[in-house]
């Protein structure tokens, strides 16, 4: 191993080996004085080790050391983190010529000749006699660099006198370094004024008639160029492109320059694209920059057929047209506007966009023109691609001085560079080293100046050119506007690796891994560039921008204190020469340049890993023995690992070559050619550095010992024959596979899988007839069951001779056909003799005809064929007639016959040709003359325009034709035209096969397959009667990495779609429609049969997140195989099997996977056009997936915009693309571990979630400000009195003083036990002012629960009213009655309160049976209030109703937010709340209220004329509430958990078209949706997941419950950082347990779906189902299983308890009848619950079931339980009601009905039904009678129902109150009516 000090001769090598010396002052270093010689040697050795570590780029340094016994070689391992005193010197043998070292430390003896740099200590142990010097040879160090190295030694020795710090913290910059570096980097310069295109405009005035552009396709003067660009810019302005990015895809031409200038003049930014790049890469760039238009030169428009992107072709014709319009608008961009967006290679596999602004480019180009000595006589040969930033310097730099830019054609540029330079008489050119090497000075006599950049320059090229012209080396990156260093005027002996000096401000060199540390002059470090020409940053990538464009490090203060300009980290390694010029040393980490193109090695490695299927890949640029830079991929060779001492590089074997060959195919489609490795090197092992990173330097060194040819030959294709099949049959199958898949025979062996080699279901179908011709009889099912070649052949042999698969007999007997002909003829409008045959329809045909009847024009495919001029049209018509005669399916009509159903009739008739003037006329004709029962289903027309070629039009109904048939039909026409015989085909054979399938077998299959299915329809229908009308479409192209898979594209697409549906519906049991080709049926010739064999099936996929991708695909493929015999059963038959099958067939998404069907381009007719139109489909969403190859799939979505919005579909396609790539690349990954969040999702999430700042204010202080601002304004208007703001402030302050004197300290919790009263806001404010936090208690709660709350709080006192004095005495020993408050008591000094102090606690249901208290701080609540007050229109004029129970946190927002906004709190009494709400609201003149939907349902808008604003919250609402209220008030909806300051989201306006599930956008917080089972994983946009709330409104946690707090208030997930680069990450987020999804509006608003866990809300009150279950299990000790859930029979929300005593495992889950014994038992259980739980937490329904159902993941299937009750009527669920003991004063009804009801009783029954079912009174549905002896609660009523009934009944003259409803029988209520 060698470790040599580098040659630092400043680029001027000399042969001088004489020793020179520099003396160092030893007096500064105490460790070198008064110590022993051995100690001095140790210090010098350590110092020298650190020096070599800094200069040699090596962490294991070696050097010579002289001791008393002579010279030896020593080694020291140096690391950044090791403290210098811990460095250890180890012996490493005798010093000699072969030691590989050239430096040393000596004691003054003889210096060996091999040492070129030595640190010498002369003298004895005495101070005065010691001296220190550094001796060097001039051939190693120049005098300047020697002084720099000596200064570094002094700095290190100085550091060693101090503390024992890590080596990495030693400052190695001596004073000389600081002074020199300061001289190298001067102060910054001002940015030039004006915009980039102003350069050209200035030349128009000065040199208007001089040539600006001289191109292969024309010349333009400056004036002409400006005129054309101005005209085009006006058109671009009219398109609204100002301020946007406009891609330009163009070859070099005058029009490309015109386009660039026009884009700039239009106020837009130009983004050049390379036409030769893969289309997918181009589309990605266009999408990333959000372009609305793309400019192209002729020939490239077809590359950008993208929705929403206009393509503008820049050509003379287009400019002439633009000139005619007269538009000449121009927009002047601002100084900071973007001018160009340039694309570079990105580490993630996607290109990254660099935004260059006008000032930066102008600065760079002005300096470039000056340094390049441009003049008006300069003729610049513009060589580089427009995507290369230097091209901008060439173009605009030349034009800035009035010169001429010469643009060659692509052919000239690449094939005859010398000739092109001569022809254009070019005087200047910027070239890469590779391009310059191909030229000789004698070939280009006019060339005066050459600038070279982009890659290293060879010495021989410098020698050849430096004496013939001005040769300059340039350096720069896209981020520095193309260049920043220039080394002009090279001599023939110049060092070409010297990049020059910074001509614009500064270039700094820092430690390669730490920009905060400068390195000494001469040491290698990373180049940092500072100056006005830096880019703005990376487009849409703040994280990468922050990483590369950094603020000034601390060391900048040593040179320019107060400097604020940014620095760019280049990732290039360089070193200073002693004159300040910079020498290139290599690339840092993953960046490199090859042939002048900057590439990201990490990106290439990513693609190569995917293509090769291995992680062990290193890609680097190798400089070969013959001095050629080769992009090389190093990979582990397959097979057993080799010994560590064996050769590193191996010769490739066949396995390695095969991997490389396959990989190259994939790389060609995913990477530009410049980024594809040209050499693949097999390794025996992957060498690692000491830090366990790939040892790239070792790989480059070893590979660099080879020539370019030797490298390329390592993996050259030299395949040995694959394992030969053993039998003749296997050889036949091998040949068939080879023909079918286009593979060489040698690549197919007996163990190969059909699907692994690229086969799919389509190829399997084609294989069957090919094999039959060779005597191998197999079916498509055989291929799926036995995919390996050897297994498949063996199966064929084992199966023996094939069974009959030819179905020739008509499925309808001949005598029956004759009997049916008259009726068939009548329906078809023909003679009976014209009917050839009649036989049944397949289920597909029946279904398609039925759907067509619902929507005219549906399922009609119109195809157009261009007829070449040489074709005889009459002869073509006859050929079509011949084919139609031979194919009865094209003469088939469908009829419906009485008693026997749909049949198809073959009619003997010729083609009826239509002659039309346009295709639209033909389509319209087929719509008006619909393809219905009895009509022709195949129609032909000719379109023969005068000037264009004739076209043949064919319209055919899908009931007789499918896409598979299209190319088959064309082939038959081709044969007929050529005079060849056309074979007869009969579709009845396929029909006979379908009819022969036993229906009962298929029904049993589907019954089993769909058992217990509980899918969710997606997308949702607006209503049950709605018929989807898909009128819109979107499409995208999926490009996959090349992957060899055993699974078909169909299986992979089905899995991905199932995964997305599961996410978007929140259901792991997924069903969607899937279309099968039907060509797997065992029918002879089915692969060539022309006719509709398609089948649509309900495909059920049960997602198991623990399964791997491969296992899930295997399961899907096996299911598909099992389904094949039953796929023709038809949806209309499957739906009748049972309710579960019916639900499964109600899907609204259909997935179609088909092979590419571009149509054969036949000689007879041109390309077929059969654009898929949305009207072909009848589902809300249809996905058509065209598999165009193993790695390309065209996705097209057809959708109904009323069911799913376009933005949502775009999200789905993006996610499906992302999912396909992952399923393709990581087959071993668990489904749960797949990341389905697409790049588009991340972009939207970043937009929707921005940081919120907390409001640093206390709540009572905000209210006090209102007291100062409007002291006499009414703050409280209550039934028991009114308070102004001044009075409220004064009373609360006095009460606060009393609380403080009674021991309420800062942070104490004070319960408030009050009825609704004006004293409640007084008490709330008083507690806050006293420094405490209030807790509102509901006096209706059980005493046991209230005691539990007070005990948890350790409350020092309870504030109570006189009414609740006794109850309060049971809660605390110390009471304070508000009625006894001393109004004359003096005001005392109160403690300070901080925004971070608690303001209140609110208790919610707890899963352990104990309520849990949520603590909210002042700042949290204040932030939320400020965020929602304005959008909710809560103003000082608002009079807000205080309606909510004190147990509901909405009561807090009713009080506090209102008062903070300066409004008035309108308080009603408890009696008014339940009995006379309308009157109370009117009396208080309330204008604003927060209510739950349950309450609103009981109210009539007309009863509340004063209300102007209504916000619904607390529970889910329905459309009815919106429809009833949106026309009367400003309707809103809010959402928020108690843990997040009451309100977290707000939808500020609800209209009749609003989605009732929409809870709006976040307020005072950010809302993230995460995986429902793992909050560390983001959920894809649009999918259902758990809502996480982040931001200042998040509460402190649960009082005294660390476990529950940590579970719900968790640390912010790591992924939040990617959305907040450079920002502080929030400490915690709150897991709400609510399932939500983003609205399809894609505006960041949320849809509420359900609770994730067992926590729900009922009538606005939050409860934990597990708490109810806990108490119920305690009371029902005999029950083995209990589930409590919220159910909605008839739309009415109730709490139900399901239980089972004897589990019936084999029985379906169903409700059992309630027995008398069970009722008696439950009547004893209910009182036990009522004693422990609030009334809203006690179940109403008690339902015994056969068993508790489980989901596929073995969790309780709550959805299944809810469905048991969902359709029950009140009469049906009445037996399951167990009455409350508080309502038991009346005897329970025995079900006896009065024979005759009074008029009042009939009216009351109708009102009760309306309340219980939500029906309108006019509904005609009969309802069972209700016994007048019943209690309202016994038939499903509750307190809210009582309120609703009271409101309705009052309008009908009844006088009872809500309390009467709960306590009286229905008969007694009926008698309470005014006559």
Curated annotation (Swiss-Prot):
Function: Nonribosomal peptide synthetase; part of the gene cluster that mediates the biosynthesis of ochratoxin A (OTA), a mycotoxin composed of a chlorinated type I polyketide dihydroisocoumarin moiety linked to L-phenylalanine, and demonstrated to have nephrotoxic, immunotoxic, genotoxic, neurotoxic, and teratogenic properties. OtaB is responsible for the linking of phenylalanine to the dihydroisocoumarin ring.
Origin superkingdom: Eukaryota
Catalytic activity: 7-carboxymellein + L-phenylalanine + ATP = ochratoxin B + ADP + phosphate + H(+)
Keywords on record: Ligase, Phosphopantetheine, Phosphoprotein, Repeat, Virulence
Annotated spans, Adenylation 1: 202-590
Induction statement: Expression is down-regulated in the presence of fennel, cardamom, chamomile, celery, anise and rosemary essential oils. Expression is positively regulated by the cluster-specific transcription factor otaR1. Expression is also modulated by a second regulator, otaR2, which is adjacent to the biosynthetic gene cluster. Stilbenes such as resveratrol, piceatannol and pterostilbene downregulate the expression of the ochratoxin cluster.
Gene Ontology annotations for the cellular component aspect, listed alphabetically: cytoplasm
Family classification: Belongs to the NRP synthetase family.
Class of enzymatic activity (EC top level): ligase
Matches recorded under PANTHER family: FATTY ACID SYNTHASE, NONRIBOSOMAL PEPTIDE SYNTHETASE
Organism whose genome encodes this protein: Aspergillus carbonarius (strain ITEM 5010)
The protein's name: Nonribosomal peptide synthetase otaB
The Carrier domain, residue ranges: 724-800
Protein's UniProt keywords contain Phosphoprotein: yes
CDD domains: A_NRPS_SidN3_like (cd05918), FUM14_C_NRPS-like (cd19545)
Pathway in which this enzyme or protein is active: Mycotoxin biosynthesis
Application of this enzyme or protein: Stilbenes such as resveratrol, piceatannol and pterostilbene affect the expression of the OTA cluster to reduce ochratoxin A and B production and thus could be used as naturally safe and efficient compounds in food active packaging or preservatives against ochratoxin A in food. Pterostilbene with methoxy groups demonstrated greater inhibitory and antitoxic activity than resveratrol and piceatannol.
Modified residue annotations for O-(pantetheine 4'-phosphoryl)serine: 761
Cross-referenced InterPro entries: AA_adenyl_dom, ACP-like_sf, AMP-bd_C_sf, AMP-binding_CS, AMP-dep_synth/lig_dom, ANL_N_sf, CAT-like_dom_sf, Condensatn
């Amino acid at each position: 191993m060698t470790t040599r000090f580098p040659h630092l001769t400043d680029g001027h090598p000399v042969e001088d080996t004489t020793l020179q010396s520099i003396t160092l002052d030893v007096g500064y270093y105490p460790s070198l004085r008064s110590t022993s010689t051995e100690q001095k040697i140790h210090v010098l050795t350590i110092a020298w080790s650190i020096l070599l570590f800094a200069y040699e780029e090596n962490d294991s340094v070696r050097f010579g050391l002289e001791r008393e016994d002579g010279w030896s070689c020593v080694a020291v391992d140096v690391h950044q983190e090791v403290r210098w005193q811990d460095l250890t010197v180890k012996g490493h043998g005798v010093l000699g010529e072969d030691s590989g070292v050239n430096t040393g430390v000596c004691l003054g003896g003889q210096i060996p000749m091999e040492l070129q740099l030595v640190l010498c200590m002369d003298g004895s142990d005495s101070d005065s006699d010691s001296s220190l010097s550094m001796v060097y040879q001039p051939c190693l160090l120049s005098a300047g660099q020697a002084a720099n190295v000596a200064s570094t030694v002094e700095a290190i020795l100085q550091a060693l006198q101090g503390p024992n710090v890590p080596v990495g913290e030693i400052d190695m910059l001596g004073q000389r370094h600081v002074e020199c570096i300061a001289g190298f980097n001067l102060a910054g310069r001002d940015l030039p004024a004006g915009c980039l295109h102003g350069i050209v405009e200035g030349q128009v005035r000065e040199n208007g008639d001089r040539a600006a552009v001289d191109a292969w396709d024309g010349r333009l003067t400056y004036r002409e160029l400006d005129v054309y660009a101005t005209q085009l810019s006006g058109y671009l302005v009219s398109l609204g492109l100002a301020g946007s990015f406009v891609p330009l895809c163009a070859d070099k031409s005058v029009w490309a320059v015109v386009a660039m200038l026009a884009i700039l003049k239009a106020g837009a930014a130009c983004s050049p694209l390379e036409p030769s790049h893969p289309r997918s890469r181009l589309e990605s760039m266009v999408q990333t920059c959000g372009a609305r238009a793309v400019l192209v030169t002729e020939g490239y428009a077809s590359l950008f057929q993208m929705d929403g992107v206009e393509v503008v072709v820049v050509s003379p014709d287009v400019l002439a047209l633009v000139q005619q319009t007269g538009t000449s608008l121009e927009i002047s961009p601002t100084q900071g506007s973007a001018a160009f967006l340039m694309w570079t290679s990105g580490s993630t596999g996607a290109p990254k966009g660099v935004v260059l602004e006008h000032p930066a480019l102008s600065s760079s180009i002005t300096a470039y023109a000056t340094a390049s000595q441009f003049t008006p006589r300069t003729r610049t040969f513009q060589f580089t691609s427009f995507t290369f930033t230097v091209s901008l310097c060439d173009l605009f730099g030349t034009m800035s001085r009035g010169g001429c830019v010469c643009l060659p054609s692509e052919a000239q540029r690449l094939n005859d560079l010398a000739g092109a330079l001569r022809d254009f008489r070019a005087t200047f050119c910027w070239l890469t080293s590779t391009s310059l090497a191909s030229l000789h000075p004698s070939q280009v006599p006019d060339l005066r100046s050459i600038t070279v950049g982009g890659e290293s320059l060879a010495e021989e090229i410098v020698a050849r050119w430096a004496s013939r012209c001005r040769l300059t080396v340039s350096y720069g990156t896209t981020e520095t506007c193309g260049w920043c260093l220039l080394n002009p005027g090279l001599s023939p002996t110049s060092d070409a690796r010297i990049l020059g000096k910074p001509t614009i401000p500064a270039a700094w060199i820092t430690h390669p891994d730490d920009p905060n540390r400068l390195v000494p002059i001469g040491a290698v470090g990373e180049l940092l560039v500072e100056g006005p020409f830096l880019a703005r940053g990376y487009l849409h990538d703040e994280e990468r921008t922050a990483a590369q464009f950094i603020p000034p490090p601390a060391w900048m203060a040593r040179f320019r204190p107060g400097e604020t300009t940014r620095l760019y980290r280049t990732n290039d390694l360089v070193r200073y020469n002693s004159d300040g010029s910079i020498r290139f040393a290599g690339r840092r980490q993953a960046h490199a340049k090859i042939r002048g193109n900057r590439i990201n090695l990490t990106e290439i490695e990513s693609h190569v890993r995917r293509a090769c299927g291995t992680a062990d890949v290193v890609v680097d640029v190798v400089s070969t023995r013959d001095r050629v830079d080769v992009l090389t991929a190093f990979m582990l060779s397959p097979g057993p690992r080799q010994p560590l001492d064996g050769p590193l590089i191996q010769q490739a074997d066949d396995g390695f070559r095969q991997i490389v060959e396959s990989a190259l195919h994939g790389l060609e489609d995913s990477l530009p050619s410049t980024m594809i490795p040209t050499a693949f090197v097999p390794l025996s092992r992957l060498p690692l550095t000491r830090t366990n990173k790939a040892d790239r330097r070792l790989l480059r060194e070893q590979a660099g010992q080879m020539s370019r040819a030797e490298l390329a030959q390592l993996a050259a294709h030299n395949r040995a024959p694959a394992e030969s099949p053993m039998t003749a049959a296997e050889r036949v199958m091998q040949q068939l596979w080879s023909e079918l898949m286009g593979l060489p025979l040698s690549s197919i062996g007996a163990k190969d899988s059909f699907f692994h080699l690229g086969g799919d279901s389509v190829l399997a179908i084609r294989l069957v007839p090919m094999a039959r011709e060779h005597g191998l009889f197999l079916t498509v099912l055989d291929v799926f069951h036995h995919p390996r070649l050897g297994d498949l052949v063996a199966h064929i042999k084992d199966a023996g001779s094939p069974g009959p698969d030819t179905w020739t007999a008509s499925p309808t007997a001949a005598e029956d056909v004759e009997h049916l002909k008259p009726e068939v003829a009548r329906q078809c409008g023909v003679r009976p003799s014209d009917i050839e045959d009649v036989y049944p329809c397949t289920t597909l045909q029946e279904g398609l005809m039925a759907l067509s009847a619902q929507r005219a024009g549906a399922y009609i495919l119109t195809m157009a064929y261009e007829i070449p001029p040489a074709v005889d049209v009459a002869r073509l018509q006859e050929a079509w007639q011949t084919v139609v005669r031979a194919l009865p399916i094209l003469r088939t009509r469908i009829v419906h016959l009485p008693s026997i159903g749909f049949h198809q009739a073959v009619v003997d008739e010729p083609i009826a040709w239509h002659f039309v003037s346009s295709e639209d006329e033909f389509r319209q004709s087929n719509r008006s003359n619909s393809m219905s029962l009895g009509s022709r289903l195949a129609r032909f027309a000719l379109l023969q325009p005068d000037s264009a070629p004739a076209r043949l039009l064919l319209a055919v109904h899908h009931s007789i034709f499918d896409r598979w048939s299209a190319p088959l039909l064309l082939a038959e026409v081709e044969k007929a035209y050529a005079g060849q015989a056309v074979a007869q085909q009969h579709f009845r054979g396929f029909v006979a096969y379908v009819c022969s399938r036993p229906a009962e077998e298929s029904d049993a299959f589907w019954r089993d397959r769909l058992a217990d299915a509980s899918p969710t329809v997606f997308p949702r229908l607006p209503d049950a009667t709605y018929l989807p009308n898909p009128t819109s479409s979107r499409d995208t192209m999926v490009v996959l990495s090349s992957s060899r898979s055993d699974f078909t594209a169909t299986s992979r697409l089905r899995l991905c779609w199932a995964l997305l549906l599961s996410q978007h519906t929140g259901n792991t049991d997924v069903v969607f429609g899937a279309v099968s080709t039907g060509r797997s049926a065992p029918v002879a010739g089915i692969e060539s049969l022309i006719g509709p064999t398609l089948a649509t099936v309900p495909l059920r996929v049960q997602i198991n997140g623990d399964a791997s991708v491969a296992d899930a695909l295997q399961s899907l493929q096996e299911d598909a195989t099992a389904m094949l015999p039953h796929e023709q059963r038809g949806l209309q038959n499957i739906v009748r099997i049972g309710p579960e099958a019916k639900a499964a067939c109600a899907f609204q998404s259909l997935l179609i996977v088909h092979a590419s069907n571009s149509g054969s381009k036949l000689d007879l007719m041109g390309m077929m056009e059969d654009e898929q139109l949305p009207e072909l489909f009848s589902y809300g969403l249809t996905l058509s997936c065209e598999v165009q190859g193993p790695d390309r799939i065209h996705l097209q979505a057809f959708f109904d915009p009323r069911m799913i919005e376009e933005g949502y579909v775009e999200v789905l396609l993006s996610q499906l693309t992302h999912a396909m790539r992952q399923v393709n690349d990581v087959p071993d990954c668990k489904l749960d571990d797949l990341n389905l969040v697409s790049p588009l999702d991340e972009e939207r999430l970043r937009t929707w979630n921005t940081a919120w700042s907390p409001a640093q204010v206390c709540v009572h202080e905000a209210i006090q400000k209102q007291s100062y601002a409007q002291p006499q304004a009414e703050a409280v208007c209550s039934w028991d009195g009114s308070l102004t703001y001044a009075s409220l402030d004064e009373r609360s302050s006095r009460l606060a003083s009393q609380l403080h004197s009674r021991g309420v300290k800062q942070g104490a919790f004070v319960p408030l036990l009050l009825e609704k009263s004006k004293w409640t806001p007084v008490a709330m404010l008083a507690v806050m002012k006293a420094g405490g936090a209030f807790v509102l208690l509901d006096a209706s709660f059980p005493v046991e629960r209230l005691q539990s709350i007070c005990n948890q709080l350790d409350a020092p006192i309870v504030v109570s009213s006189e009414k609740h004095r006794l109850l309060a005495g049971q809660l605390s020993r110390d009471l304070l009655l508000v009625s006894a408050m001393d109004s004359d008591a003096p005001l005392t000094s109160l403690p300070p309160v901080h925004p971070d102090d608690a303001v209140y606690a609110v208790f919610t249901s707890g899963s352990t049976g104990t309520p849990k208290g949520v603590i909210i701080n002042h700042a949290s609540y204040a932030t939320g209030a400020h965020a929602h007050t304005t959008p909710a229109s809560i103003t000082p004029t608002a009079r807000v109703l205080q309606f909510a129970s004190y147990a509901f946190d909405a009561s807090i927002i009713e009080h506090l937010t209102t008062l903070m906004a300066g409004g008035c709190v309108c308080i009603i009494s408890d009696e008014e709340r339940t009995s006379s709400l309308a009157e109370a609201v009117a009396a208080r003149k309330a204008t604003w209220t927060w209510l739950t939907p349950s309450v609103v349902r009981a109210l009539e808008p007309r009863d509340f004329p004063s209300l102007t604003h209504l916000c619904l919250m607390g529970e889910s609402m329905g459309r009815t509430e919106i429809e009833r209220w949106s026309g009367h008030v400003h309707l809103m909806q809010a959402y928020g958990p108690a843990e997040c300051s009451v309100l977290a989201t707000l939808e500020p306006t609800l209209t009749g078209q609003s989605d009732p599930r929409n809870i709006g956008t976040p307020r005072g917080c950010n809302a993230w949706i995460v995986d429902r089972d793992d909050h560390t994983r983001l959920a894809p946009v649009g999918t259902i997941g758990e809502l996480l709330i982040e931001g200042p409104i998040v509460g402190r946690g649960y009082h005294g419950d660390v476990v529950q707090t940590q579970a719900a208030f968790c640390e912010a997930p790591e992924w939040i950082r990617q959305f907040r680069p450079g920002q502080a990450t929030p400490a915690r987020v709150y897991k709400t347990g609510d399932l939500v999804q983003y609205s399809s509006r894609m505006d960041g608003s949320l849809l509420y779906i359900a609770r994730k866990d067992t926590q729900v809300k009922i009538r606005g009150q939050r409860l934990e189902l597990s708490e109810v279950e806990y108490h119920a299990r305690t009371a029902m000790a005999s029950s083995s299983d209990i589930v409590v859930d919220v159910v909605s029979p008839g739309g009415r929300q109730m709490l139900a308890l399901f239980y089972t005593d004897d589990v019936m495992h084999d029985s379906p889950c169903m409700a059992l009848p309630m027995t008398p014994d069970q009722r008696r038992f439950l009547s004893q259980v209910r009182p036990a619950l009522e004693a422990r739980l609030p009334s809203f937490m006690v179940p109403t329904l008690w339902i015994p079931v056969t068993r508790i159902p489980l989901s596929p993941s073995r969790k309780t299937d709550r959805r299944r339980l809810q469905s048991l009750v969902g359709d029950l009527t009140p009469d049906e669920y009445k037996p399951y009601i167990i009455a409350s003991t508080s309502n038991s004063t009346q005897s329970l009804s025995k079900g006896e009905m009065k024979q005759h009801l009074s008029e009042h009783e009939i009216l009351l029954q109708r009102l009760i039904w309306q309340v219980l079912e939500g029906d309108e009174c006019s509904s005609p549905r009969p309802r069972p009678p209700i016994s007048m002896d019943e209690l309202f609660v016994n038939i499903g009523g509750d307190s809210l129902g009582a309120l609703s009934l009271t409101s309705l009944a009052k309008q009908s003259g009844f006088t009872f109150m809500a309390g009467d409803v709960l306590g009286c029988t229905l008969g007694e209520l009926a008698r309470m009516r005014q006559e």
